[in-house]
């Protein structure tokens, strides 16, 4: 415990606790179960200088190695000055592997106003067969994961729990992994969020885990973003953002030996660029809900997810909940927006190649829908259903310059349609599934 702590060496406390705290007054609490908690009663104010009189930018810095197998590592600091760069700067390694059924734990707490930068490794993975993943908790005002590796993997056991909170901003530029025999749980909470790296909670022989994302403002995902909860049966992904989601990455909830999982994505404004969302399974398709529930949750007493106001999906997007094996029913996909939806891309809920019923797709809006997607719901006489039930609908070309021009104009913000709508009748050039329902009298 000191105003500033810098570790460049090796600290070992297997089955014990390594605690590093920056503050002028700190309370140590023995909370039971061999765990210790630190509370900063008074943070350090003003400058902190090294022995040579040089300004120290970080309250806690670790470029070395901290090891607490079967124990816990706690780094905690609070910011009371605008002078410092980071309250926690983690460029080295912290390992609290789970051993002999004793889960490891890593806690990095930067307080409500501190910046936390992680460019190293955090690891609470199981070390021997049968050891589950441990727990990792990271919290700060701004949390930057810069080519880091955060792992809580199970060794022939369940993955662990990883919770990361950036109250103003969270940037995921390094891999997060809670995979195991069955997947663990990953929770990301942020003011604003960017994802440019894999986030994994895969199950090798059991069910995939869960990834839950909550953002108060906006969420961006580039082509390097991968959210994967695949397993023998698929797990669950939820991305609930208040204002806007712009997605170009991949969401996977595959069932490699069973039914696909579930994917729920919603925000007031949704923009699906070149992204892939796949909840397919070898024995049954899963469920994908983008922007709302069936008919916008019209007949539900309590909505499970908020409705999007606008939704834009380019023709490069692929949304799939099909059966990848010979037997099984196709999945269920809902694409919804209260005000305006423009949906191109490809949607697939086809059943097994030999048996199984076709799946269900609803693409709609409480007001205006422009539709030019390619939708597959059935195979031969094993038909599925495509439901288009907006108040107003425009059927657009499912490819070529029409959909691309419309999507690009809408994405750039020059009016919702930019005058690029195409009024066409359904014909053989439009790729729909086996059955189409148009219901304009629902409202």
Locations of regions flagged by a protein language model:
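Extracellular and secretory-pathway beta-repeat/beta-biased strand scaffolds
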Residues: 1-443
């Amino acid at each position: 415990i000191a105003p500033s702590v810098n570790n460049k060496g090796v600290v070992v406390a297997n089955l014990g606790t390594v605690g590093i705290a920056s503050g002028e007054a700190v309370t140590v609490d023995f909370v039971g179960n061999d765990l210790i908690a630190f509370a900063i009663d008074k943070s350090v104010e003003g400058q902190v200088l090294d022995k040579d009189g040089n300004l120290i930018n970080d309250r806690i810095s670790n470029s070395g190695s901290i090891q607490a197998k079967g124990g816990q590592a706690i780094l905690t600091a609070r910011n009371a000055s605008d002078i410092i760069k980071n309250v926690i700067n983690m460029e080295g390694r912290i390992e609290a592997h789970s051993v002999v059924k004793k889960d490891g734990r890593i806690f990095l707490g930067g307080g409500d106003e501190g910046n936390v930068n992680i460019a190293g490794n955090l690891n609470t993975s199981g070390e021997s067969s049968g050891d589950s993943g441990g727990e990792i908790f990271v919290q700060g005002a701004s949390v930057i994961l810069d080519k880091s590796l955060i792992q809580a993997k199970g060794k022939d056991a369940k993955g662990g729990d990883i919770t990361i909170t950036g109250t103003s901003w969270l940037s995921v530029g390094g891999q997060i992994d809670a995979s195991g025999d069955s997947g663990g749980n990953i929770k990301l909470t942020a003011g604003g969020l960017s994802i440019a790296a894999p986030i994994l909670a895969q199950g090798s022989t059991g069910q995939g885990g869960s990834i839950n994302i909550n953002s108060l403002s906006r969420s961006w995902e580039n082509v390097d973003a991968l959210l994967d909860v695949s397993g023998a049966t698929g797990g669950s992904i939820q991305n609930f953002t208040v204002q806007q989601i712009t997605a170009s990455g991949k969401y996977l909830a595959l069932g490699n030996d069973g039914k696909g999982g579930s994917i729920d994505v919603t925000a007031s404004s949704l923009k699906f660029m070149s992204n892939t969302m796949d909840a397919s399974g070898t024995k049954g398709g899963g469920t994908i809900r983008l922007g709302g529930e069936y008919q916008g949750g019209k007949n539900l007493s309590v909505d499970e997810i908020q409705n999007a106001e606008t939704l834009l999906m380019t023709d490069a997007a692929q949304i799939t909940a099909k059966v990848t094996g010979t037997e099984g029913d196709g999945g269920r996909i809902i694409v919804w927006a209260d005000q305006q939806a423009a949906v191109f891309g490809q949607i697939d809920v086809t059943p097994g190649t030999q048996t199984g019923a076709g799946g269900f797709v609803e693409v709609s809006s409480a007001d205006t829908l422009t539709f030019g997607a390619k939708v597959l719901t059935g195979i031969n006489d094993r038909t599925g259903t495509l439901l288009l039930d907006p108040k107003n609908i425009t059927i657009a070309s499912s490819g070529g310059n029409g959909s691309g021009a419309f999507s690009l104009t809408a994405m750039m913000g020059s009016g919702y349609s930019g005058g690029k709508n195409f009024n066409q009748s359904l014909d053989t050039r439009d790729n729909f599934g086996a059955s189409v329902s148009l219901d304009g009298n629902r409202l």
